Amino acid sequence: MLLSDKAIRSLIREGKLIIDPLYEDSIRENGVDMRIGPEIAFPIVRGEVMDPTKDDPSLHFTVRRFSDEGIIIPGNTSILLVTEEYIKMPDDVAALCGLRSSIARWGFIAAPTLVDAGFEGQLTIEVMWTRPAPVRLYRGIRFLHVVFFRTEGKVERPYSGAYQGQRGVTLPKRLEK
Protein backbone atom coordinates (compact mmCIF):
# COMPACT_ATOMS: atom_id res chain seq x y z
CA MET A 1 0.00 0.00 0.00
CA LEU A 2 1.31 3.45 -0.96
CA LEU A 3 1.69 5.60 2.16
CA SER A 4 -0.01 8.98 2.45
CA ASP A 5 1.52 12.16 3.84
CA LYS A 6 -0.30 11.46 7.13
CA ALA A 7 1.17 7.92 7.36
CA ILE A 8 4.67 9.21 6.49
CA ARG A 9 4.46 11.92 9.19
CA SER A 10 3.30 9.28 11.69
CA LEU A 11 6.30 7.02 10.92
CA ILE A 12 8.63 10.00 11.32
CA ARG A 13 6.99 11.11 14.58
CA GLU A 14 7.29 7.55 15.97
CA GLY A 15 11.00 7.44 15.01
CA LYS A 16 10.46 4.48 12.66
CA LEU A 17 11.39 6.46 9.53
CA ILE A 18 14.26 8.92 9.78
CA ILE A 19 14.90 11.62 7.16
CA ASP A 20 17.60 14.12 8.10
CA PRO A 21 17.39 16.97 7.41
CA LEU A 22 13.62 17.03 6.94
CA TYR A 23 12.05 20.15 5.47
CA GLU A 24 8.33 20.61 6.06
CA ASP A 25 7.72 21.40 2.38
CA SER A 26 9.37 18.10 1.41
CA ILE A 27 6.48 15.93 2.60
CA ARG A 28 4.03 15.75 -0.27
CA GLU A 29 0.60 14.13 -0.70
CA ASN A 30 2.04 10.63 -1.10
CA GLY A 31 5.80 10.87 -0.74
CA VAL A 32 8.84 12.96 0.15
CA ASP A 33 10.86 15.25 -2.11
CA MET A 34 14.62 15.14 -1.65
CA ARG A 35 17.28 17.68 -2.56
CA ILE A 36 20.58 17.54 -4.43
CA GLY A 37 23.36 17.02 -1.88
CA PRO A 38 26.91 18.36 -1.74
CA GLU A 39 28.61 16.09 -4.30
CA ILE A 40 28.28 14.90 -7.86
CA ALA A 41 30.17 12.21 -9.77
CA PHE A 42 30.98 12.52 -13.46
CA PRO A 43 32.06 9.64 -15.69
CA ILE A 44 35.64 9.72 -16.96
CA VAL A 45 35.56 8.96 -20.67
CA ARG A 46 38.78 7.37 -21.89
CA GLY A 47 37.58 5.59 -25.02
CA GLU A 48 38.57 2.18 -23.67
CA VAL A 49 36.31 -0.75 -22.87
CA MET A 50 35.22 -0.78 -19.24
CA ASP A 51 34.80 -4.09 -17.43
CA PRO A 52 32.47 -3.62 -14.43
CA THR A 53 33.41 -7.10 -13.14
CA LYS A 54 37.14 -6.25 -12.92
CA ASP A 55 37.72 -2.48 -13.00
CA ASP A 56 38.08 -0.27 -9.95
CA PRO A 57 35.04 2.06 -10.21
CA SER A 58 37.12 5.02 -8.98
CA LEU A 59 39.09 4.87 -12.26
CA HIS A 60 35.93 5.69 -14.20
CA PHE A 61 34.43 8.53 -12.12
CA THR A 62 35.53 11.87 -10.74
CA VAL A 63 33.75 13.33 -7.70
CA ARG A 64 33.26 17.09 -7.28
CA ARG A 65 31.65 19.25 -4.62
CA PHE A 66 29.04 21.87 -5.49
CA SER A 67 29.98 25.53 -5.10
CA ASP A 68 27.57 28.46 -4.81
CA GLU A 69 27.84 28.89 -8.59
CA GLY A 70 26.59 25.33 -9.13
CA ILE A 71 28.13 22.83 -11.53
CA ILE A 72 27.77 22.77 -15.30
CA ILE A 73 26.72 19.42 -16.71
CA PRO A 74 27.81 18.86 -20.33
CA GLY A 75 25.13 17.88 -22.82
CA ASN A 76 24.09 14.22 -23.06
CA THR A 77 25.89 13.28 -19.85
CA SER A 78 25.18 10.68 -17.19
CA ILE A 79 25.95 11.76 -13.60
CA LEU A 80 25.58 10.43 -10.08
CA LEU A 81 23.75 12.73 -7.67
CA VAL A 82 23.48 12.22 -3.92
CA THR A 83 20.59 13.40 -1.78
CA GLU A 84 21.15 15.98 0.92
CA GLU A 85 18.93 13.85 3.15
CA TYR A 86 20.07 10.78 5.08
CA ILE A 87 17.28 8.22 5.33
CA LYS A 88 16.76 5.28 7.67
CA MET A 89 14.03 2.88 6.56
CA PRO A 90 11.92 0.71 8.88
CA ASP A 91 12.03 -3.07 8.42
CA ASP A 92 8.46 -3.09 7.09
CA VAL A 93 8.64 -0.22 4.57
CA ALA A 94 10.31 -0.04 1.15
CA ALA A 95 10.43 2.96 -1.18
CA LEU A 96 10.59 3.75 -4.87
CA CYS A 97 12.38 6.86 -6.19
CA GLY A 98 11.79 8.79 -9.37
CA LEU A 99 12.63 12.28 -10.58
CA ARG A 100 10.21 15.08 -9.80
CA SER A 101 8.24 15.95 -12.91
CA SER A 102 9.53 19.54 -12.90
CA ILE A 103 13.16 18.41 -13.29
CA ALA A 104 12.21 15.67 -15.77
CA ARG A 105 10.46 18.25 -17.97
CA TRP A 106 13.77 20.11 -18.29
CA GLY A 107 15.31 17.01 -19.87
CA PHE A 108 16.64 14.86 -17.02
CA ILE A 109 15.81 11.16 -16.79
CA ALA A 110 16.57 8.47 -14.21
CA ALA A 111 15.66 4.82 -13.86
CA PRO A 112 13.28 4.11 -10.97
CA THR A 113 15.33 3.18 -7.91
CA LEU A 114 14.20 0.85 -5.12
CA VAL A 115 15.11 1.60 -1.51
CA ASP A 116 14.99 -1.64 0.47
CA ALA A 117 13.40 -2.13 3.87
CA GLY A 118 16.09 -1.61 6.50
CA PHE A 119 18.32 0.56 4.28
CA GLU A 120 19.97 3.61 5.74
CA GLY A 121 22.16 6.24 4.12
CA GLN A 122 22.10 9.03 1.61
CA LEU A 123 20.68 7.99 -1.75
CA THR A 124 22.93 8.01 -4.81
CA ILE A 125 20.92 8.22 -8.04
CA GLU A 126 22.14 8.02 -11.63
CA VAL A 127 20.64 10.87 -13.65
CA MET A 128 20.98 11.49 -17.38
CA TRP A 129 20.92 14.99 -18.88
CA THR A 130 19.42 14.31 -22.32
CA ARG A 131 19.78 17.67 -24.04
CA PRO A 132 22.78 18.56 -26.24
CA ALA A 133 23.37 21.92 -24.50
CA PRO A 134 25.06 22.14 -21.08
CA VAL A 135 22.96 22.81 -17.98
CA ARG A 136 23.83 24.24 -14.57
CA LEU A 137 22.72 22.40 -11.42
CA TYR A 138 22.80 23.65 -7.84
CA ARG A 139 22.94 21.97 -4.48
CA GLY A 140 19.57 22.09 -2.72
CA ILE A 141 17.31 21.73 -5.77
CA ARG A 142 14.43 19.34 -5.07
CA PHE A 143 15.03 16.66 -7.70
CA LEU A 144 13.84 13.31 -6.36
CA HIS A 145 10.41 12.09 -5.25
CA VAL A 146 10.33 9.07 -2.93
CA VAL A 147 7.14 7.07 -2.38
CA PHE A 148 6.86 4.58 0.48
CA PHE A 149 5.14 1.19 0.57
CA ARG A 150 4.39 -1.11 3.50
CA THR A 151 5.63 -4.66 3.10
CA GLU A 152 3.47 -7.54 4.31
CA GLY A 153 5.07 -7.61 7.75
CA LYS A 154 8.70 -7.02 8.63
CA VAL A 155 11.19 -8.46 6.16
CA GLU A 156 13.21 -11.43 7.43
CA ARG A 157 16.50 -9.95 6.25
CA PRO A 158 16.57 -6.14 6.27
CA TYR A 159 19.01 -4.55 3.83
CA SER A 160 22.64 -4.94 4.90
CA GLY A 161 24.45 -4.67 1.57
CA ALA A 162 27.46 -2.74 0.33
CA TYR A 163 25.65 0.61 0.26
CA GLN A 164 24.37 0.46 3.86
CA GLY A 165 25.26 3.64 5.75
CA GLN A 166 26.60 5.41 2.66
CA ARG A 167 27.37 9.11 2.94
CA GLY A 168 28.25 11.30 0.00
CA VAL A 169 27.99 10.28 -3.62
CA THR A 170 28.76 6.55 -3.69
CA LEU A 171 30.34 4.96 -6.75
CA PRO A 172 29.05 1.61 -8.02
CA LYS A 173 30.54 -1.57 -6.68
CA ARG A 174 32.09 -4.16 -8.99
CA LEU A 175 29.54 -6.45 -10.59
CA GLU A 176 29.67 -10.19 -10.00
CA LYS A 177 29.37 -12.74 -12.79
UniProtKB/Swiss-Prot annotation:
What this protein catalyses is:
dCTP + H2O + H(+) = dUTP + NH4(+)
SUPFAM superfamilies per UniProt? dUTPase-like (SSF51283)
Under the heading InterPro entries, the entry gives: dCTP_deaminase (IPR011962), dUTPase-like_sf (IPR036157), dUTPase_trimeric (IPR033704)
Cystine connections: none
Q: What positions does the entry give for dCTP binding?
A: R100, S101, S102, I103, A104, R105, D116, Y159, Q166
GO MF term set: dCTP deaminase activity; nucleotide binding
Name any Gene Ontology BP term: dUMP biosynthetic process
- Pathway of this protein? Pyrimidine metabolism; dUMP biosynthesis; dUMP from dCTP (dUTP route): step 1/2
UniProt keyword list: Hydrolase, Nucleotide metabolism, Nucleotide-binding
Its EC top class is hydrolase
Where are the annotated coiled coils located?
A: none
What top-level branch of life does the organism fall under?
Archaea
Q: Which residues form the active site?
A: E126
Cross-referenced CDD domains = trimeric_dUTPase (cd07557)
Give its E.C. classification number.
3.5.4.13
Q: Which family does it belong to?
A: Belongs to the dCTP deaminase family.
Query: Subunit structure of this entry?
Result: Homotrimer.
Protein task: Catalyzes the deamination of dCTP to dUTP.
Protein name (record): dCTP deaminase
